[in-house]
Every structure is written in structure tokens, then in C-alpha cells.
Amino acid sequence: SSSRPEVASIEPLGQDGLRCSQRALVQARSSQPTRLTAIISAEDTLTGQVLRCDAIVDLIHDIQVVSTTRELYLEDAPLELKIHALDSEGNTFSTLAGLVFDWTVVKDPEANGFSDSDDALRILKFLESTYIPPSYILEMEKVAKQGDTILVSGVRTGSSKLKARLQESIYKDVHPAEVRLFILENILLNPVYDIYLLVGTSVQYRVQKLSQGKIT
């Protein structure tokens, strides 16, 4: 149950017609531009033990793009990017499910020697890949919307900047999140294994490039 259903409602996720469930969906209901808290509680019908937690509903103050790397290699698997949102106190929101974002690839004015291009990077749909995203992302893609998680793939070498903006009008003053990505050639050294040399001996290395699944 929720102590303040007008702030955060709770819906059991179990068999139809049953009030008891081990899982539940908590949804933010408040539309007020202020920080509000509701107490979510669950009771074990056998032992009477009560579990509780606070559900804090607040406005987003800042967004950031989170990535495992800033470098992509041509011919590599797509890179998954995700948005983290923070409140005014720096706390991270638990979920951004359902929020619509506008992701765009823009030119990078600070390429620092890299070829700057807005066509070096391509945004992919999860529906076009073998990746399995959260179910709400797939539902948003079906209606041509973008959520807090996307895939990107390198098209050609260079540097590109990716920008993400919240579409909700209430967040028009929240600065877009940006991330700079570098797309590099997939270069290999042959031989690829460790070499142990005697003093005075040498070994010849060859540089090879992976292109369209073939080494050239």
C-alpha cells in the first residue's frame, strides 16, 4: 500500500483478482513541481512482518550520458548509452521509464585533430539489433520515440558528439546531456601473440585492418 496514492500509487503484479503479490508496480502520480514522499509498505500475510520504503517523487535537475567507453571501432558491436538523471541534491533517480528523450548526433567543434563529422556515428534501434533492452524501450521504439537508452554504431572514422534532451516541456530549462565519441579503425598487429626474442634477433610485424569481416 501507499501512504499517499496521489504522490505514488502501487499496483500489485500478480494473478488477476488477487490482492496479494510478491511484485508490484510503483508509479509517480504527483504533478506538483516540488519534492514529495510516499511510504510504500508490504505485509507478509503469514508472519505479519511489514516491509517499507520511501518513494521520493521530485523534478529532474540534471542529466548525464553514461557509457562504458568513449571509443568505438568500425565493425565492432554497437555501444549502449544510457541517461542518468539527478535531482537538485545530486541523488540519482531509480528509473526514467516512460520519459521521452531526443537523441541527436551533432558536429564536434573540439575534435582536437580528429575528423569532425556528424555522419561518423549512427543511432540504432534495439528492434534492429540482437540486444534486449527494457520492455518500455521496445514499446517506445514501436511508436517512433526514444527513451533513456539507445545504441550507437560507428560508420566511419572521426569524432562525433551525441546530445540528449528531455522532451517534456516542464524540463525545458534542463541542459542537454552531451558525450563525445571517437570512431577508430579496427587495426590489428600480426602476429598477435607474445613474442620472446633473443638478444640480437628481430621479428617483423605487419599491420592489418579489419573491414567488412575480412582482414586486409
For each predicted feature, which ranges?
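Extracytoplasmic soluble-region selector
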Residues: 1-216
